[in-house]
């Protein structure tokens, strides 16, 4: 049964465990406290979910175009979960990274797997600084696939909790797709460096550069040329998840 609703994803308890890059997400050994959770927005597909997508976003409120894109993903059969990464009082406007990011992602991962989604059928997707977050998740968690759109912080970390993407690209554990345009925060020479760095990882990677700014599914264009770019970027997102979340 399809639908859109809000829910909570319990955080795992902070118990000593291996949190290195080789750790695979698993269900928490003990039940989290009731006040330790991540607020999430869920969009369900019609019928059986073929996999789950954690959509990381930098907005405290969803735009109409972002919700429309989430519904399009659900229309392809994906169970879409979007966490509120700013639920902590300490959350920075620059984004959520480091242990807090991984904790929130793990909560969403557990929420999905508890509803029958296989671990290798969970993907991550993010735009802008949330695209940076999706990339960093893919270097720390062996999920099914990851996609970053216009992700900054390529050669210099965005915050003290983040790492420069080129510095950790060789540690990618999930097939990764990067979509970039002419944003000032993602210079083409840096994007080329990221492409080369990601190629050294043991998983598939693909970087696509668009000539304009309107290549993102969360910022639809107003004319036919913009629409053509938008359709191309959406198709690449759908195809990447189709190919790797099986």
List the predicted regions and their residue ranges.
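N-terminal cap/leader regions of alpha/beta-hydrolase-fold enzymes
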Residues: 1-246
């Amino acid at each position: 049964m399809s639908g859109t609703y809000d829910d909570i994803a319990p955080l795992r308890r902070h118990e000593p465990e291996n949190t290195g890059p080789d750790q695979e997400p698993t269900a928490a050994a003990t039940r989290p406290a009731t006040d330790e959770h991540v607020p999430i927005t869920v969009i369900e597909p019609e019928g059986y979910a073929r996999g789950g997508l954690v959509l990381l976003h930098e907005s405290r409120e969803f735009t109409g175009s972002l919700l429309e894109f989430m519904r399009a993903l659900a229309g392809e059969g994906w169970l879409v979960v979007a966490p509120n990464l700013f639920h902590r009082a300490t959350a920075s406007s620059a984004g959520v990274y480091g242990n807090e990011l991984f904790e929130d992602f793990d909560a969403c991962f557990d929420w999905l797997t508890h509803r029958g989604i296989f671990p290798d059928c969970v993907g991550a997707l993010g735009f802008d600084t949330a695209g940076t977050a999706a990339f960093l998740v893919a270097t720390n968690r062996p999920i099914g696939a990851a996609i970053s759109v216009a992700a900054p912080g390529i050669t210099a970390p965005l915050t003290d909790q983040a790492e420069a993407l080129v510095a950790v690209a060789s540690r990618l554990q999930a097939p990764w797709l990067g979509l970039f345009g002419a944003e000032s925060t993602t210079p083409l020479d840096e994007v080329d460096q990221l492409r080369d760095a990601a190629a050294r990882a043991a998983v598939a990677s693909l970087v696509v550069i668009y000539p304009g700014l309107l290549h993102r599914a969360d910022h639809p264009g107003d004319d036919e040329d913009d629409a053509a770019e938008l359709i191309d970027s959406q198709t690449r997102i759908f195809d990447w998840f189709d190919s790797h979340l099986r």
